[in-house]
Amino acid sequence: MKNLRQVFSWCLFDFANSSYSAVIAAVVFPVYYATTIVGNDVGQGDLWWGRAISFSMAFVALSSPFLGGMADYSGRRKRFLLIYTTLCVCAVACFSLLREGMVIEGFILILVANIGMEGGLVFYNAFLPEISEKEYQGRVSAWGFGIGYAGSILSLLLALPLVRAGRFAETWIMVSFFFAVFSLPAIILLPRDNKTGLSVLGSAAKGWTYFVSVMRQISGNPELRKFLLSYLAYEDGVNTVIVFSSIFAATTLGFSPQELIGLYLIVQVTALTGAFIMAKPIDLWGPKNVVLLSLLLWSSVAVSAYFIAAKMHFFILASFAGLGLGTVQAASRALFTQFIPEGKESEYFGTYSLVGKSSAVFGPLVFGYISSNFNSQRPAILAVSLFFIAGFFLLLSVNGGGPNVRKKG
């Protein structure tokens, strides 16, 4: 392996940003913003949170081809990683200034923080081929993934006593400090920028041209098009469940902040378990069948959530959702690889990542608007099941998913 220190620092960055993913994006801050800052009596908190997630992810998705070009062609990866990380860290620290009724200020800070987080990942991911030989990249990526889970768990455990004491401002400061401190090794040790002479605007334009070229290649593969459309649909449902599950549990079922953290930890453990248990069936049954099975599970979870009233039942349901989460992520990636021409892995996975980011745009808006219009989160969570059902039937029409992709006629 090229440089173990660089590999470790790269993995540690995943550990760092997982504090944002867990505490800010998934568990504690969504409930705080929706119920304390906005007030969620008539679904307005859901509406504003859904808008914030959708708008920020739409911005990141639309800018990703340009950011990818800047990462690949300008030679300024580390500089932009630092800029986007600083943007996120500072915005999260500013959460501590929010007070009840500061809806717009909170909305703007969420936009900035999420753009900083998701935009920075474009440059973070671009370092992987530079720090690791191809034969080790899968392992290094998995190490980052595993260390990231550890970061999620540790940051939630650190947040727990603060949340229990109602010291939310200090919770946001803790997350920003956690992110900043553990991202420093990556900022210091990752390879230095090697400017190419191409301007930032020039490299962004080249990234867009490259993206258009890849999209043209994809348009010539009808099975891949259908899979990506299916993935866009069901992944939107998955992302919506992730960003609204804590708000649903707190508002509809009366979960306390401590219970929400426990709920998230259960989901993390079951997600890892699901990915591990289904690793062999993905190969034996084919990734398409495993994804279809996962979507049936996700649809059942969303429909069941509509009827659930007891906290214990929701804990059990969340365990099944976690199993489906780990499985659908692993199987979807395995299925996508079957459509990639040899030697085109990097550019095709860039498109896969873009579709993944785009799949957090519509679902949160749908949940927020239905919740506010019906003054209930139950019809909103029921509507999310439609994303899984649509993805299921779209995937059924895809010719592939076994040992090899079968081409029609």
Over which residues does each language-model region extend?
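Juxtamembrane intracellular "pre-TM" segments in multi-pass secondary transporters
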Residues: 1-7, 193-229
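Short amphipathic helix-loop junctions that connect adjacent transmembrane helices
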Residues: 22-46, 243-260
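A membrane-interface helix-boundary motif in multi-pass transporters
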Residues: 42-46, 161-177, 369-388
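Helix-to-loop junctions at the C-terminal end of transmembrane segments
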Residues: 62-76, 273-287, 371
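Structural signature of the two symmetry-related core transmembrane helices
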Residues: 79-94, 289-304
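Hydrophobic core of transmembrane alpha-helices in multi-pass small-molecule transporters
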Residues: 91, 102-120, 313-327
